[in-house]
Amino acid sequence: MTMSEFTLKTRLLAALEGKPVDKVPVCSVTQTGIVELMDEVGAAWPEAHTNPELMAKLAIANYELSGLEAVRLPYCLTVLVEAMGCQINMGTKNRQPSVIEHPYPKSLDGAAVPADLLQKGRIPAVLEAIKIVREKVGPDVPIIGGMEGPITVASDLVSVKSFMKWSIKKTDLFEQALDIATEAAIAYANAM
């Protein structure tokens, strides 16, 4: 591929692979939902966390209005853990959602990846928003699907305090929590 043949997507992929590019891609791999853009496009939190149309609209705003060379969504690290049973405070227009209750702080009795994981919580909204974004920006714009990794998922399921204690005193529970979290993260990532 010659330098002039790069699309936004092929340029980002080449840069991530350490290959030569015509210019450094400009994108955000963390969330991009800022209050000014929410106001500009009429897609604000917390509604844009649950409504796929608003989620897509806000995500595309940074590409269209700010010139970022990728679209990134969703806007928090609680989508997967909500589907796994964590209670979530959905935040406000200028505050991201956060975990307020952990389902397994004492033991992992009953802990497992739900068979219907991809139909739980906000996961369907995120997956639908990704489809909407792809339809609107076409195949040549990178879409960055943000999500929690296994350590974040595990520590949210059991609480950071238990997770840290288990890493030293109950390594079997620590490893089990990570196994469950890894399985869930892989399923969610593959669906994105």
Question: How should each PLM-predicted stretch be described?
Answer:
Residues 85-191:
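Active-site-proximal, glycine-rich beta->alpha crossover segments in alpha/beta enzymes
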Residues 1-2, 190-192:
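Short, intrinsically disordered, charge-balanced linker/junction segments flanking boundaries
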Residues 1-2, 45, 116, 164:
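Short, flexible active-site loop motifs that bind/organize anionic cofactors or intermediates
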